[in-house]
Amino acid sequence: MHAPDADPRHFPMKELEFVLMMASFQALQALAIDIMLPALGAISRDLELADPNQRQLVIGVFLICSGLGSLFPGALADRFGRRPVVLTAIAAYMLLSVLCAISGSFQLLLVARGVMGAVTSAMMVMPTTILRDRFDGDRMARTQSLIVMTFMVVPMIAPMLGQTVLLFAGWRWIFGIMGVLAGCVFGWAWLRLPETLDPRNRQAVQFKVIAGNMGTALRERSSIGYFLGAAFTQGAMFGYLNSAQQLVGEHFGAGTLFPVLFGGMALVMACTNFANSRIVERFGARRVSHAALLVYIVLGVVHLLLAFRGEDLWTFLPLMTLSMCMMAFMGSNFQAISLQPFKRIAGAAASVMSFVRVVLGAVLGSLIGQAYDGTARPILAAMVVFGVIALLLVLYSERGRLFRRINPPEYYRNNPPAVTPPAS
């Protein structure tokens, strides 16, 4: 699995291929969530679940285990490199897709989904780490927005793909499609992905070193408010994902239109990420994300008040889509800001941030999902509360001041000094 170290100044991929490859890594993990949404009802009937809300565990267990597993890929990648970790994760994804497909009980399916989430968490951590290897600050936020915009194709088409499979075959075939797609991405990465870890930044695989690097990431005030804030807003989104099929498909009566409506929301979010990639280098990641967070809170309050007065699908959907768009403006920018201080330990920092963001977000999302009462009120109330908490956390990181430009890498004590290339 060895590839020559890539000099960032002479990276072998053009930007388009790089964006597509990083998006494909993240898309595989998103596919494991979104393609399952139309199948949850079929799984519930086929495996004879007593409580209809249990079906949400197919999503919730995967997300929680993804967060728990994300502690490890970064530390391994800081020692052995990004490429071997990525390839191992994709290979495991293929094998575990087969195990999910042949599961004979709901318990075995949950175990397989949990292991799949843990092992393949690298596919969310590594793109961020590789991106941090190559870019800083607002440029990183711009490229991350392009990656997210591209990867948003998955939630646009995955539910419709899952629905199509169910028309012609059982839910188990969905996992077969996941395995085949993972095989294609594995071949592409094997042939084209170079190693981006600077040999000077290679870290030892020792508990003391790993714990020290993760502790450094957790102690950085300028970072912690952003990735904790992202965890709370992501928790609200996970809560919506967990309940989306019941809320939109059943309560609001969308029925078979649910995958189309879900995909339409994802399309709008993809456009938002493209807009972010166009404006973030001009206005700065902080200014864009701070404005989005404030609008997100206001939208949540307005939507919650409407929900108590009574709403239909065509009131709910536009307002929820606007809220998700604000999350799109926050996501890439929060990530870039929180990783800015950690060029030397990018893998460990990305891992611990992903762990906190996904585990906390998944736990909060599962609690929201289990609180589903046949209305949108639990989700909307969580969005307001979690949005306010995120704002307080950002204010802590910013020492009470919003809308500043992002600091250069050399501002932070955790980053090595810039190396000037020798004159030719």
Q: What residue ranges belong to the model's regions?
A:
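Helix-loop-helix hairpin linking two adjacent transmembrane segments in secondary transporters
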Residues: 108, 138, 142-191, 197
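Paired small-residue
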Residues: 92-99, 107-115, 314-322
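Conserved MFS/SLC helix-loop-helix module at the cytosolic interface between two early adjacent transmembrane helices
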Residues: 68-107
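Residue-level signature of mid-helix packing/kink "hotspots" within the transmembrane helices
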Residues: 34, 63-71, 155-156, 266-274, ...
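Helix-breaking motifs and short loop linkers at transmembrane-helix boundaries and internal kinks
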Residues: 49, 81, 102-108, 119, ...
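Extracellular/periplasmic helix-loop-helix junction of adjacent transmembrane segments
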Residues: 39-68
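Juxtamembrane intracellular "pre-TM" segments in multi-pass secondary transporters
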Residues: 2-12, 194-226
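Cytoplasmic helix-loop-helix junction between adjacent transmembrane helices
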Residues: 112-153
